[in-house]
């Protein structure tokens, strides 16, 4: 599950960076056309050098972003190769990457049920540690009671070289052991095991609370980045329209060149914001998937022991229903003696 989330994060990071390069190149092309027009007007004496240098500065600044983004793209590709167990280099699966980011279906989570938390391996591990430590109390308490052992032996002896047995001996009987004089040590051991149980219970609670926090944080990010998508999309379209109007009014002499440069900057900024928010929304969904232990749909938790392993173990030993029992979420501590 963690590996799947890591692969998804790197993959969509790669696709986002590809789109950022595309946005930068498109905006650089727009700014280059403005620079060419401004340079021609400057040579004809119709524009000042200030307008020319401003157009050149904006164009070159945007163009300089492309190598940086291309470097990030290669790093993401190499990271993805490493996760997939490959040497750094081309990843054939990335050759046919679709251009737009996918649309994520609406995620609805009304609460965080306990069964959802129990999907997480850290929470399940903490729960099993509680169960294991709870059993240690019973083991320690068993020393309060006497232990009965059945002993027996059978022997033969012979005084001849042929080895024919002449004397046969059989002995059998019970043995009783009771550490009655170690009562204080036994009591303190029970207390020690109970204290350790309480410690594992607190660790389990902390694991569950941390898991619930991570799920809630990721869910909030999913909701809020989703709410931003429509306004940012409209803002980017408005920026495109604003640039078209600015270019038209500038050519007709109603606006100065600064307004055109401003419109170009706004278009680049809004296009980047829309893309980065879409990417953040996908990342939030991946984080939610990971925080919820593999999804948020209420489905049965995987078996404690895989079927094949369980069958092998049951063939060796009579386990009863222990290997099929659900994972305990809490344990009864009992009273320490």
Residue ranges and their predicted role:
Residues 82, 86-87, 287-297, 330-332:
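Long amphipathic alpha-helical coiled-coil segments
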Residues 271-311:
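A contiguous, mid-protein "functional segment" used to position or interact
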Residues 3, 26, 50, 54, ...:
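Sec/SRP-type N-terminal targeting helices
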Residues 90-109, 115, 138, 151-191, ...:
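Small/polar, glycine/serine/threonine/aspartate-rich low-complexity segments that form flexible
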Residues 1-112, 221, 225, 245-248, ...:
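Periplasmic alpha-helical coiled-coil/stalk elements that build and connect Gram-negative outer-membrane
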